[in-house]
Each structure stands twice: as C-alpha cells, then as structure tokens.
C-alpha cells in the first residue's frame, strides 16, 4: 500500500493534469508570455512528473522486494550458528576457543550479557536513523558469522559430516548473506535518488510543478479576474508543497 506522502505526490501530479485541461480549454486567451507557463511546457512538465512518480514506485518495489529477500536469507542464521557451536563443543577445541565461539554465537543470537534478545529492527521504518540502525545490525551479523567461520576453520577436528556445517557450505552461506545485504543497500540508494529526483521536479523553487501551478493560477487570475468563472474553476485545485 502506498504511504500517505506518496499518495500526496501523485495527487499533485494528477491535479496538475486537471489544471492543464482547464488552461487548454481557454483556447487562445491562455497565452502567457513566460515560456514555463505555456501549454507545451506544462505538458512536458506533467509528463516528466509522471515519469518521476513511476520511477519512485519502481524503486520502492525493488527496495521492498530485496528487503524481504534479505530477511529470508538471514532466517536460518541463528539455528545454523547454534548447530555450529554444538558441534564445536564436542571437538577437542580448547576452553578458550569454545568460550570465543560462545561469545560469537551469543552475538548472532542477539544475546548480550545482562540484556534481552535484540533482533535487527524491522524494515518498515522511513527515517534515516531507522535504516542506519537496521543496516548496522545486518552488517554486524554478517561480520560475526564471518568470524565464526574463521574460528572453526582454525580447528583441525572441526570436520562435520553434515553438509550444511562444512566450511564450504558455511562460506557459501556467508556469501549469500553479503549479497542479500548489498542488494538492499544498493536498492536503498536507488530509492533515495529516485525520491530526490522526483522532489526536484515537483518542488524545486520556481521551476517545480507546485510553484509552476501557482504561477499558472496567478496568470489566469490576472487575465480573467479574481471573480471570474475561469479563475474559480482552477483556484480550488489543490497543490501541496513538500513538508521540510
């Protein structure tokens, strides 16, 4: 479902189409001297705005998809880490090595001394801080799992018969975690850039769709009059500026 803010951007573009339709209906009377207010320019701006809205929607869908993929990729991590630790515990690893492994496993489980279980935050957040914390959580999980692999690789008797516990399988799983995390980071950047581009087209000072729409209204008011039927047709068409 689209967020309220995304609906607001799309509504601005839809209302701009309505504004153009009224201006077109005024015929030759609508003939502003300013190029940016002329019908050809308005139609170009409308088409560009439509493209920007579509680009943001596509980028968001991609971001949502790879975010879900990452969550699925990381789901087996905790149980796998437990299996690794349990197998390691029955090897001839030193007490220190087992203690180090326990520390890493606790981090992967989200456990810390004196604290409750702490999982990566949900991906629904929209603030930069929420995204940053989430990214750090997944980065940390990936790094700790890599450390786990390094640790068990140093133990000669770590030779499990279970395929999923072999160093080869663990390394492949670690690579899949890295890939899933990188895909989210790249999609996040693309989504952010798409929003920046859209906001520039819709809300840039003087040249953005909202400011241009305001100027169109002023022009119609000037040529037809504040109490004219023509101005009343468009004066109520609402355009909402971006909240800073």
Give short role names for the model-derived ranges.
Residues 1-244:
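Basic/polar low-complexity intrinsically disordered segments
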């Amino acid at each position: 479902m689209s967020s309220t803010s995304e609906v607001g951007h799309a509504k601005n573009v839809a209302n701009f189409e309505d504004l153009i339709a009224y201006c077109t209906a005024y015929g030759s009377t609508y003939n502003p001297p300013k190029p940016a207010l002329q019908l050809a320019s308005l139609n170009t701006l409308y088409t560009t705005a439509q493209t920007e809205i579509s680009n943001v929607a596509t980028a968001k869908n991609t971001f949502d998809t790879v975010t879900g993929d990452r969550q699925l990729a990381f789901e087996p991590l905790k149980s796998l880490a437990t299996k690794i630790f349990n197998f390691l515990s029955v090897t001839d690893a030193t007490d220190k090595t087992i203690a180090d492994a326990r520390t890493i496993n606790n981090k992967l489980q989200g456990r810390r001394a004196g604290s409750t279980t702490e999982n990566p935050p949900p991906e629904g957040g929209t603030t930069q801080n929420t995204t940053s914390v989430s990214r750090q959580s997944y980065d940390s999980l990936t790094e700790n799992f890599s450390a786990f692999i390094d640790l068990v690789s140093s133990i000669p008797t770590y030779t499990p018969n279970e395929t999923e516990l072999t160093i080869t399988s663990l390394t492949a799983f670690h690579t899949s975690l890295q890939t899933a995390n990188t895909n989210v980071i790249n999609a996040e950047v693309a989504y952010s850039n798409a929003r920046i581009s859209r906001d520039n087209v819709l809300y840039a000072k003087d040249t953005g769709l909202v400011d241009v729409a305001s100027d169109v209204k002023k022009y119609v008011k000037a040529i037809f009059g504040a109490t004219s039927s023509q101005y009343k047709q468009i004066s109520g068409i609402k355009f909402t500026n971006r909240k800073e």
